[in-house]
Amino acid sequence: MTKSKPATKKNEWTVKDSCSLYGLDLWGEEYFSINDSGNVTVSPQGKEGNSLELTHLLEELKGRNLNTPLLLRFDDILEDRLKKLHQAFENAINQYGYNNDYQGVFPIKCNQQRHVVEEIVTIGRKWHFGLEAGSKAELLIALALVNDPKAFLICNGYKDNRYIETTILARQLGRQPIVVIEQSDEVGRIIKASQKLGAAPLIGIRAKLSNQSSGRWGNSVGEKSKFGLSIPEILKAVQELTAAGLLNELILLHFHVGSQINDIAILKNALQEASQIYVELNRLGAPMGHLDVGGGLGVDYDGSRTATSASTNYSLQNYANDVVATIQECCKAKKVKVPKLISESGRFLSSHFSILIFNVLGTSSVPTQIAIETSNECLSVKNLRETLMILHQICEEKKIDVSKLQEAWNDALKFKEDALNAFRLGFIDLTERATAEQLTWACAKQIAAHLPNDLKIPKELLAINKGLTETYYANISIFRSAPDTWAIQQLFPLLPIHRLQEKPDQLGHFADLTCDSDGKLARFINNGQEKFLLELHTVKANENYWIGMFLGGAYQEVMGNLHNLFGSTNAIHIRLTKNGKYKLDHVVRGNSKSDVLQAMEHDSEQLLERIRMASESAIQQGSLKINDAQRLIEHVETSLRQSTYLQE
């Protein structure tokens, strides 16, 4: 891993500076780095394995007609994350002498893509790793893919009679589905289904903890949380199960404190409360034996190791240690056998393995070129020219007076407004208005280039930089590929994957392809904080400028939508080979235009026929030549088969 170090010589820029700037040595763990050529590399097997240069990989994928935007899925990273998770719990179990083991499950909702779930099931078989389902459709996936009789199928979510009956029948297939009671009325459904089929499911109860959480998913716990039983409801459920002769099937307690726990103290409090509930259920006669601590094992998106929304103040080993130690302490005090531990750590497992790569289509910036002065310019334009001259003089002073900069900027804004008012009233023409805008931006650029590093800089002057930034047009839809950036303001690491031996010379943000003002990436990680501009390079003519969004393997693909009918991108599953090279295990083609049209109930053949009929009519009227009509139809036919994104 490249370590952060400032450049040693004045004006010299190195890959170490880029590594520090984008935080790669903080959030990249053992997987992502920068080589001496300034290109991002991925080491899917961690520090012990070989690395791949992403730009080289992209060039070879282009040779296979697989162009950006692309999702690169590194299945070796999935395997490495599974190994790390089990190793952490094994270490904790050995350290504390915990007399049971850990056996996790993957929540299908994190990434429901078939190849992803299949890969996790295959890799996880050595640990009897199972799946968690939160719906009837996800239950069917779990039943079909998990054929290990020792692996758990945790059945969460709302349940009707058919859901529960399916789990009972699946148990007779040799599977281990555990129906987790999350609503009080599910107790009656379980009893009814058991009586109907003459068999019972394995049963768990989700507790609604009183402990308060924090962050975006803080409402996952507490008295008003969506799922779980309150303490009175748990006691009532035990009574009903006892009366129905089903208490012996109650083997699991489950709780959940949010998708991303950023503060380990929240988990500790939840573990203490849940452990007490567990021993009480055992005391009431339930066999128990299993404690599911839910999801929440967090991902440090910015590498700051802080209790912020984009980070965590604990490591994986801290997490495993606290789970094991807290539960053991409580059970030991009450002389209850410690349970088998289960977690639903989907975000931790799947975030790192997927990288979204997109190309920049172009850029735009504010107009700062100054028009040649003419003799009959209006007063506001003359005043703006004079203000710009004053700014040049201020900036040539040995010590720049910020108050003078502020005064000049206030003048520039007033003169610009004068020009706009004159244009609205018809006193100046479009050319003079354009000149006024150019001069105003030239004033802004002059101020931004000479602002001293002073904490007392007025906010109005600090905001100038934001107005001068470049907009980089990205060949993606954030609503399809990064919906959490829009929906919950999630931060993901973004950076160029090449040219990192060069010092960035621009500040910018990204605008996507959608016709939506929310379609942008304008918030970026910044070592525990966030920034609204990203350091980027000037895009060179006739050269690709590739950007990578990292740590997006959980939820982004499955929650994306078809806004403006931009569909899924191509997804490539990549594995390292023993000779140090790589192979493409799976190529999952993204949506074509025909696919997304069909999703909205537009039949491609019908659309094509309507265009053909319109062309024929135009031919009859003499407004369209036959060869041009054929060319149009061929264009449409080809376009229907192609990606919804722009072609390189």
From Swiss-Prot:
Required cofactor names: Mg(2+); pyridoxal 5'-phosphate
Parts forming coiled coils: none
InterPro entries the UniProt entry points to: Ala_racemase/Decarboxylase_C (IPR009006), Arg_decarb_HB (IPR040634), Arg_decarbox_C (IPR041128), Arg_decrbxlase (IPR002985), De-COase2_CS (IPR022657), De-COase2_N (IPR022644), De-COase2_pyr-phos_BS (IPR022653), Orn/DAP/Arg_de-COase (IPR000183)
Keywords from the UniProt entry: Decarboxylase, Lyase, Magnesium, Metal-binding, Polyamine biosynthesis, Pyridoxal phosphate, Spermidine biosynthesis
GO biological process: arginine catabolic process; spermidine biosynthetic process
Highest rank taxon of the organism: Bacteria
Binding positions for substrate per the UniProt entry: L291, D292, V293, G294, G295, G296, L297, G298, V299, D300, Y301
Catalytic function, reaction form: L-arginine + H(+) = agmatine + CO2
Enzyme nomenclature, EC number: 4.1.1.19
Entry-annotated residues carrying N6-(pyridoxal phosphate)lysine: K109
Record keyword Plastid present: no
GO-annotated molecular function: arginine decarboxylase activity; metal ion binding
UniProt function note: Catalyzes the biosynthesis of agmatine from arginine.
Family (UniProt): Belongs to the Orn/Lys/Arg decarboxylase class-II family. SpeA subfamily.
Protein name, as recorded: Biosynthetic arginine decarboxylase
